[in-house]
Amino acid sequence: MEPAFGEVNQLGGVFVNGRPLPNAIRLRIVELAQLGIRPCDISRQLRVSHGCVSKILARYNETGSILPGAIGGSKPRVTTPTVVKHIRTYKQRDPGIFAWEIRDRLLADGVCDKYNVPSVSSISRILRNKIGNLAQQGHYDSYKQHQPTPQPALPYNHIYSYPSPITAAAAKVPTPPGVPAIPGSVAMPRTWPSSHSVTDILGIRSITDQVSDSSPYHSPKVEEWSSLGRNNFPATAPHAVNGLEKGVLEQEAKYGQAPNGLPAVGSFVSASSMAPYPTPAQVSPYMTYSAAPSGYVAGHGWQHAGSTPLSPHNCDIPASLAFKGMQAAREGSHSVTASAL
């Protein structure tokens, strides 16, 4: 029965790609060659490729072996458990030792010879994979041994007590019989102030302490704050106002100047001296501007010296403006005098 897998070569023989030739066929090739048969005839007779026959015969003539594989076999393993043990010992004695120093020590101590000593890369791989974790574990164990036993954690802000009114009220309520008592810190959340709050920095009692003055707790911060009196602060001179000399303030008030172009602050006009607003006269919608400008707008004190009431910035305006359809109205219109305004 032919095998279920395989290929047929050019001579009609069956072979499996990637697998060596069976030892029986190899031995038969060597026997036929010793009988003086040419390799080409052996190839045709056994239906094996000519290259395979030539390679088997060449290896047999060189090494005397018909077995497949590399000539001389693979390199023996050099990283034996004994070598790894010595490498670990060297590393524990000197954690900063290099791989090439370990290699020299293996040769000096007679653990290996020049034929089976591991290479520097092999020693580095052993240090990284096999000894690295053990060294870290050893350092961790030694660190734990030298560490002192941890002390029980103190409660937050144990020096200054800040009982909250909720906790104080809960402590006054009696527990009914048959029900286990629950600590105040578990039953009611306590409002612990921040250690960096303004009240803690200044030494002032918090609001919760002011509410629960009847609490049996006592805070030394109250004593510290009460000890600070007015005597501890620098006294202010009687002639000083807010840290400034009174004479300086009076001098500034005496020689104070108002801004340029604006009236002084104290120059106010009383309401009784002001005349009421005049009643506007009825003016025709077709009034023209032929009248004098002073008849419509009163002058102001802040106008330019060479300007007119209608042109405060010394801009010339034509005397009259002509509009279509308003010529007749101009003749019939009456001018409004200044007394009418």
Swiss-Prot record:
It holds the Pfam family PAX. Residues 168-189 are annotated as: Interaction with KDM5B. SMART domains: PAX (SM00351). InterPro entries: Homeodomain-like_sf, PAIRED_DNA-bd_dom, Paired_dom, PAX_fam, WH-like_DNA-bd_sf. Residues 82-130 are annotated as: RED subdomain. It comes from the Eukaryota. The keyword Transcription regulation applies. Residues 7-63 are annotated as: PAI subdomain. Keywords: Developmental protein, DNA-binding, Nucleus, Paired box, Transcription, Transcription regulation. GO terms for biological process: regulation of transcription by RNA polymerase II. Residues 4-130 bind DNA. It is found in: Nucleus. GO terms for cellular component: nucleus. One of its GO terms (molecular function) is RNA polymerase II cis-regulatory region sequence-specific DNA binding. Transcription factor required for normal development of thymus, parathyroid glands, ultimobranchial bodies, teeth, skeletal elements of skull and larynx as well as distal limbs. Interacts with KDM5B. This is Paired box protein Pax-9. It comes from Macaca mulatta (Rhesus macaque). The gene is PAX9.
